[in-house]
């Protein structure tokens, strides 16, 4: 019997792996590891899931960043992806604005300081594309404050960016003391008292 390690976030759609109810192919069994990313609270089997896979090839299978995967393939890394997408998010629901930043519509983000987990995070890549394609926002004219190290090195020529740990948003409210004026992050449940980018969500509602 061959055992394959599979590193996952403990999300509801991954529950069958942790409950042992996934039918593995004959001769194979899965060892599901609960591994978080970045500096999130530690999971049962640690953190830094993406880095441990890209850098150390620690797991047989790993829930991974699509954007970083595409970058790695462009550099001839020998990873193979399966067309399974456990997270399907609209970026518009994950953009939160400083209430004092005078941001009334997406185009107002031009010239503003926007905090992101990392520049190549899949949600950040999606958000940049949505801002440009849906609202005509040239994301190259935004000052990006990066909260965490990049999983893969990249060339930042022509992009205004800086590492800014202070870009991390507090869970309750946002004051002018924050180093950023907008933040893009997928953990929406923690920010119930922080408004999203005005007018950014409504055009996307109702889409499949």
Task: List each model region and its residues.
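Short, glycine-/small- and polar/acidic-enriched structural segments
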Residues: 9-140, 144-153
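Pocket-lining segment of extracytoplasmic ligand-binding domains
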Residues: 160-208
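Extreme N-terminal starter segment of soluble prokaryotic enzymes
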Residues: 1-5
């Amino acid at each position: 019997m061959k055992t394959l390690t599979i590193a996952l976030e403990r999300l509801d759609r991954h529950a069958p792996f942790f409950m042992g109810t996934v039918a593995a192919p004959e001769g194979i069994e899965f060892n599901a590891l609960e591994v978080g990313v970045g500096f999130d609270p530690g999971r049962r089997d640690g953190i830094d899931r993406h880095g441990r896979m890209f850098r150390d090839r620690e797991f047989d299978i790993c829930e991974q960043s699509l954007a970083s995967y595409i970058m790695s393939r462009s550099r001839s890394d020998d990873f193979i992806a399966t067309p399974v997408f456990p997270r399907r998010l609209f970026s518009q629901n994950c953009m939160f604005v400083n209430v004092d930043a005078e941001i009334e519509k997406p185009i107002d983000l031009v010239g503003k300081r926007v905090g992101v987990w990392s520049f190549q995070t899949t949600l950040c890549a999606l958000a940049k594309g949505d801002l440009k394609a849906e609202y005509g926002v040239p994301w190259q004219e935004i000052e990006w404050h990066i909260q965490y190290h990049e999983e893969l090195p990249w060339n930042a020529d022509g992009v205004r960016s800086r590492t800014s740990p202070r870009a991390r948003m507090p869970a309750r409210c946002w004051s002018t003391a924050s180093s950023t004026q907008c933040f893009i992050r997928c953990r929406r449940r923690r920010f119930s008292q922080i408004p999203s980018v005005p007018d950014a969500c409504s055009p996307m509602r109702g889409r499949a």
